[in-house]
């Protein structure tokens, strides 16, 4: 189904300056949050335990919280409903235990006065493992950005490659800061959301860059701004339909999904909006700011064609025994 029977060329680049200014302000605010407030590290990165408990009656959340607060070594315990009124999720930082102590048994003993229950899941991550996971998570984001830059450089040119990475860094910073704003623990779910966002956002950007290249190869115009406007306008229907589809799916996950996946669903929801916006207004504009020019492009293409023709001529001379 098409939203528009005829493609109307919209002047996206005319308004892109405002988009860049707004993005610059948002990124500065986001960096302020990241550096001065920082993330609240989840169990995956800081170490700790996660306990899933099911009661035969409605779970006494307040009573469970009070029971843990009485214990000196259980600091920063979080208790929340999980899926149903009978089930709760208990999170607490890493607790040092003696060799003959069983943390599972200690928790069960603390919960005894709260009623009939069953511990359905008990996961513990040590501080060393958490630190390794954090390092690997950061490394995976950096490697993803480098790999994308290399790929786009080979497929297009360095200006497009750098522009796409700038847009992706913009997306990652804004979405990462939203994790702080909405008080979500930084864990592997958030890293998974950021990596998914990188793949989703670059896909939109590549489609627009592909159409820009088609406009250039057709040589209908020698104006870079016009070529970009035509490329974005011709792919706008596809971009909006894809983005809205992803947006509504992730919105359902946010509203009806379990709290345990909020670290993935909420960053993805925000990332869908930010990624679509950056693909349209940020990446093409950055390419222009870096000096992308149709005249230079045609000159480079002409040099490539001339070089290829010279190689072909030399090959024929060599095969004919004249060299």
From Swiss-Prot:
Gene Ontology molecular functions: protein-transporting ATPase activity
Coiled coil ranges: none
Cellular-component GO terms for this entry: plasma membrane
UniProt xrefs under Gene3D superfamilies: Multidrug efflux transporter AcrB transmembrane domain
Cell compartment(s), UniProt: Cell inner membrane
Keywords: Cell inner membrane, Cell membrane, Membrane, Protein transport, Translocation, Transmembrane, Transmembrane helix, Transport
One GO term (biological process): protein transport by the Sec complex
Bilayer-spanning residue ranges: 19-39, 138-158, 162-182, 189-209, 244-264, 269-289
InterPro entries xrefs: SecD/SecF_arch_bac, SecD/SecF_bac, SecD/SecF_CS, SecD_SecF_C, SecD_SecF_C_bact, SecF_bac
Keyword Transmembrane part of the UniProt annotation: yes
Pfam families per the UniProt record, alphabetical: Sec_GG, SecD_SecF_C
Membrane-topology descriptor: Multi-pass membrane protein
Oligomeric and partner information: Forms a complex with SecD. Part of the essential Sec protein translocation apparatus which comprises SecA, SecYEG and auxiliary proteins SecDF-YajC and YidC.
Job description of the protein: Part of the Sec protein translocase complex. Interacts with the SecYEG preprotein conducting channel. SecDF uses the proton motive force (PMF) to complete protein translocation after the ATP-dependent function of SecA.
Family of the protein in this entry: Belongs to the SecD/SecF family. SecF subfamily.
Descriptive protein name: Protein translocase subunit SecF
